[in-house]
Amino acid sequence: MIPPADSLLKHDNPVLISKNTERKSPKSRPLKVSSPQTVLTAPVPPPPKPKTPLLDATKPAEEILNAILPPREWVENNQLWIQQVSSTPSTRMDVVHLQEELDMKLQQRQARETGICPVRRELYSQCFDELIRQVTINCAERGLLLLRVRDEIHMTISAYQTLYESSVAFGMRKALQAEQGKSDMEKRMADLEMEKKDLERQVNEQKAKCEAIEKREAERRQVEEKKHAEEIQFLKRTNQQLKAQLEGIIAPKK
C-alpha cells in the first residue's frame, strides 16, 4: 500500500474500505452526475463568497475534525483506502517536531524565502491545518475560529490571485497593443524616410536646374551688356563724326 503524498497534517493509519471498487454492491447508491449546463451568452457571475460550515462545537472532536479537515481517499489496485485526520492530542514535542519538519521541507523543496512561492504557501497551509487540528482537539471553539481565519486567508489570497491574473492579462494586452503600435510607427517612419529621400532628390534636381538657369542668364546678360556697350560706343563715334561734319559746314559761313 502506497499512501498519498506526505503532508505536515498528521493522519491516522490508512484503512481499507473496499477490496474491489469495480464490484458494485446492490445497496450502493449510484453516483449523481450533473447534466451539462446549457452554454449561456450572458456573463457568468462570480462565485459566491465561501463560508465556513456551521458546526456544533459540542459534537465529538473526531466528527468536527472530519468536517473541517476531510479524510484522504485514494484507489490502489482496485482497493479504496481512506485516511482520517488524527485525533490524538499533541504535546510540546509534537509542536517542536512540526517546526523542525516544516523547516526541513522548506529546505528540501527549495522554497523561496521571499516573494510569491507556491511551495512555501503549500507547506505553511499544511502547517496551519496541523495547528488547527491540534487546537481543535483541545478546544473546539478555538479550532473553529481558526478555521474561519484560514478560510478568510484563502479567500483573500484567491482574490489577490484573480486580481494578479487579470492585471497580467491586461498588461499583456497593452504590451501587444504597444507592439502593434510600434510596428505601425516603424512602417510610418520608413515611409516618411523614403518620402524624405525622394523630396531631397527633387530639391537637388531643382537646385541644379536653378544653377544652370542662373549661369545661362548670367552669360546672356554679359553678352547683352557687351552688345549694348558696343552699340553705345558706335553711337558715340557716329555722333562725334556728325558733330564734326556739322561744325565743318557751319564754320565757313561765319
UniProtKB/Swiss-Prot annotation:
Primary residence: other
Compartments where found: Cell projection, Cilium; Cell projection, Cilium, Flagellum; Dynein axonemal particle; Cytoplasm
Stretches for region Disordered: 1-55
Keywords of this entry: Cell projection, Cilium, Coiled coil, Cytoplasm, Dynein, Flagellum, Motor protein
GO cellular component: axoneme; ciliary base; dynein axonemal particle; dynein complex; motile cilium; sperm flagellum
GO molecular function: dynein heavy chain binding
Stretches assigned to coiled coil: 175-245
One BP term from GO: sperm flagellum assembly
InterPro entries for the chain: Axonemal_dynein_light_chain
Family: Belongs to the inner dynein arm light chain family.
Protein function: Involved in sperm flagellum assembly.
PANTHER family xref list: AXONEMAL DYNEIN LIGHT INTERMEDIATE POLYPEPTIDE 1 (PTHR13183:SF0), AXONEMAL INNER ARM DYNEIN LIGHT CHAIN 28 (PTHR13183)
This protein's name: Axonemal dynein light intermediate polypeptide 1
Naturally occurring in which organism (per UniProt): Xenopus laevis (African clawed frog)
